[in-house]
């Protein structure tokens, strides 16, 4: 039976927002002769990945109105021979889900064009993403993201997650690079290539697409081999993103373990170690189902080796405390956590001696929200709906729908290359462009006037 996009997913009516439908939005049925370049003028090339390439475009003669990001899926390629074997699972999932999802905090799919066996997905354009914004703040002089901006980003991100989860959709790959921000400060969850429905039984993360996703944002239950997905995996990632907005670096920066020849997934020992260094060793008291995890024995081995190396270190050195800005290299005592220490050393950090720490106003409510999102036991971890009710958002400054409101920072625009802006004839991507954040940035002053 041929694969068919999962259209008409029967989402609850309350989940839809009323939205203004432009005349060009109204479906006129399948139009095989509409060419992508008849509808859009390509401004330039943005980036490429395993799926294909992304271009920036505007509507021809101002219709459709606005700027767009066009994602071109490449056909399957065997050697130099292009074989039209169909569409990847990832592309079908992204198309079917995006066609159904309509929310201010989820990137909007405007249309899908099929031309010469290539698929073009046309999305609304976002000038920034969180990776780019975080990177901008790490440039000298290093300066924290303003508290009001962090609050607004977190509220909008949680709002988008709540909408996905109400509609039985797991994103599964939330990370700063996939969280888009428009020039008007609207936060939009993007890249639903790994997203999937969870209202029916699922296979393990690795039994479908063998995709390597960044493991820094991966929930502990997945590292410990859980076969069951819940929206809690997305909430752990949101907690990691919150921590990164505060400290401007990934909180759990582990190393990717290599798959073996049998395509089995090794235990991500190093990633688990990074989590334990800040969160402590998980215990059955706090996480009753812990002992049912497939990698439970591996966890015990890791915890024992960390404890013995910590003991050896202290038997040869005078006891001393690490009050480093980014948490301790030593594991906390059994059942204990360094997260509170990590949080307060981060928000109370100031570059100017005697100055007021810029993030101090986030206070204890920020810690409670972070700790609730980074809860080991997925059944106790905050849901998006619970997190939105956090006093973190109702105390202090009003949360703005524009995360740049009152912001003095001018963020660089997304870099658009003119070298390869022929969307129809461009070669298929041979190599992925460098993933460094500054690869897609240019200073505002150098921005080309359109």
Curated annotation (Swiss-Prot):
Keyword Transcription: yes
E.C. number(s) listed in UniProt: 2.7.11.22, 2.7.11.23
Bias type Basic residues, positions: 310-326
Entry keyword set: Activator, ATP-binding, Kinase, Magnesium, Metal-binding, Nucleotide-binding, Nucleus, Repressor, Serine/threonine-protein kinase, Transcription, Transcription regulation, Transferase
Main subcellular localisation: nucleus
Keyword field contains Zinc-finger: no
Recorded GO MF terms: ATP binding; cyclin-dependent protein serine/threonine kinase activity; metal ion binding; protein serine kinase activity; RNA polymerase II CTD heptapeptide repeat kinase activity
Gene3D superfamilies: Phosphorylase Kinase, domain 1, Transferase(Phosphotransferase) domain 1
Family listed: Belongs to the protein kinase superfamily. CMGC Ser/Thr protein kinase family. CDC2/CDKX subfamily.
Subunit structure: Component of the SRB8-11 complex, a regulatory module of the Mediator complex. Interacts with SSN8/FCC1.
PANTHER family (UniProt xref): CELL DIVISION PROTEIN KINASE, CYCLIN-DEPENDENT KINASE 8-RELATED
Entry protein name: Serine/threonine-protein kinase SSN3
Organism: Gibberella moniliformis
């Amino acid at each position: 039976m041929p694969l068919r996009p999962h259209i008409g997913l029967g989402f609850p009516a309350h989940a839809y927002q009323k939205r203004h439908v432009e005349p060009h939005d109204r479906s006129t049925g399948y139009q095989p002769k509409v060419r992508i370049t008849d509808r859009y003028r390509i401004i330039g090339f943005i980036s490429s990945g395993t799926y294909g390439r992304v271009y920036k475009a505007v509507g021809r003669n101002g219709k459709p109105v606005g700027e767009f990001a066009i994602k071109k899926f490449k056909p399957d390629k065997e050697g130099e021979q292009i074989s039209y074997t169909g569409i990847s699972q990832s592309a079908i999932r992204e198309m079917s889900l995006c066609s159904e999802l309509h929310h201010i905090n989820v990137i909007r799919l405007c249309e899908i064009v099929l031309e010469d066996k290539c698929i073009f997905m046309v999305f609304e354009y976002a000038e920034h993403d969180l990776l780019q914004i975080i990177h901008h703040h790490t440039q000298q002089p290093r300066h924290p993201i303003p508290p009001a901006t962090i609050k607004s980003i977190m509220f909008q991100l949680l709002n988008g997650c709540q909408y996905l989860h109400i509609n039985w959709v797991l994103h599964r790959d939330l990370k700063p690079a996939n969280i888009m921000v428009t020039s008007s400060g609207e936060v939009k969850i993007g890249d639903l290539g790994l997203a999937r429905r969870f209202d029916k039984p699922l296979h393990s993360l690795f039994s479908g697409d063998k995709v390597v996703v960044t493991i820094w944002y991966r929930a502990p239950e997945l590292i410990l081999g859980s076969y069951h997905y819940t929206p809690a995996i997305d909430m752990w990632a949101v907690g990691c993103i919150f921590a990164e907005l505060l400290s401007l670096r990934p909180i759990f920066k582990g190393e990717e373990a290599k798959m073996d020849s049998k395509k089995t997934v090794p235990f991500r020992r190093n990633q688990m170690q990074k989590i334990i260094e800040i969160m402590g060793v998980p215990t059955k008291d706090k996480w009753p189902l812990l002992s049912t995890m497939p990698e439970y024995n591996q966890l015990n081995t890791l915890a024992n080796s960390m404890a013995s190396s910590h003991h050896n270190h202290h038997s040869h050195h005078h006891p001393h405390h690490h009050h480093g800005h980014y948490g301790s290299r030593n594991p906390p005592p059994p059942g204990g956590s360094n997260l509170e220490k990590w949080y307060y050393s981060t928000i109370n950090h100031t570059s100017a001696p005697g100055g007021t720490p810029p993030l101090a106003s986030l206070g204890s409510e920020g810690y409670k929200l972070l700790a609730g999102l980074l809860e080991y036991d997925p059944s106790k971890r905050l849901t998006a709906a619970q997190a939105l009710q956090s006093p973190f958002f109702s105390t202090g400054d009003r949360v703005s729908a524009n995360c740049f409101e009152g912001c003095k920072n001018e963020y660089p625009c997304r870099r658009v290359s003119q070298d390869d802006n022929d969307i129809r004839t461009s070669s298929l991507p041979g190599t992925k462009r460098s993933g460094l954040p500054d690869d897609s940035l240019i200073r505002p002053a150098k921005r080309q006037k359109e």
